[in-house]
């Protein structure tokens, strides 16, 4: 496919029967846009799959990912990371114990408890997608968006970091702790820039500012 794979290391052990290469010390696996570095890598030529198990780093044009264990397929551009996972982008940091990431699309697939932190917000999610190039998230399973003492949650959540807009759908709850009020409904729109939020579809507003809602 015009995408050459290069594999470097201090020591190489290759089994011709299984076609598995074990590379140790200062290991580097590179293709055109992606570099994986570790001290212990096994590469399966049949499956075209490299995996590390003693800590590693995957870097592309957008993001740097580190974890204790991981695997990367140069053919599909898919990678899987487990244990102490961190994705670092100039705009945000995503931490998790399990994460899938595609180096072609730059989409991170959240499949376990994860935190996404930026200067603008904090997101907690256990399931969904983060489009790292676009700065957008599509999240499920009661994910939570927090910003300046305000939290937005719903059965599903959409967030656009560049626009500073969050939208929640079904069984929505927006809590404004500084102003002591809450919105509920089945849809809520929240603008971080203006601090404005509104809810629709069985919407209800609750004011706690007087000590009696």
Regions found by a protein language model. Give the residues of each.
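Structural signature for solvent-exposed beta-strand/loop edge elements and short helix-capping sites
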Residues: 1-213
């Amino acid at each position: 496919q015009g995408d050459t794979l290069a594999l470097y290391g201090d020591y190489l052990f290759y089994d011709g029967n299984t076609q598995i290469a074990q590379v140790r010390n200062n290991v580097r696996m590179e293709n055109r846009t992606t570099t994986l570095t570790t001290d212990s890598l096994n590469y399966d030529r049949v499956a075209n799959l490299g995996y590390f198990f003693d800590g590693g780093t995957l870097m592309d044009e957008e993001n740097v990912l580190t974890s204790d264990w991981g695997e990367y397929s140069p053919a599909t551009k898919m990678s899987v990371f487990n244990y102490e996972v961190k994705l670092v982008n100039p705009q945000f940091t995503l931490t998790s114990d399990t994460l899938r990431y595609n180096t072609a699309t730059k989409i991170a697939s959240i499949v376990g408890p994860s935190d996404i932190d930026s200067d603008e917000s904090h997101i907690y999610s256990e399931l969904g997608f983060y489009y790292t190039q676009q700065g957008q998230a599509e999240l499920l399973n009661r994910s939570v968006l927090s910003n300046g003492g305000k939290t937005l949650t719903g059965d599903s959540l959409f967030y656009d970091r560049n626009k500073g807009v969050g939208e929640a759908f079904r069984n929505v709850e927006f809590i404004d702790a500084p102003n002591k009020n809450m919105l509920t409904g089945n849809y809520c729109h929240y603008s971080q820039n203006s601090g404005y939020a509104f809810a629709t579809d069985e919407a209800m507003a609750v004011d706690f500012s007087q000590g009696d809602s």
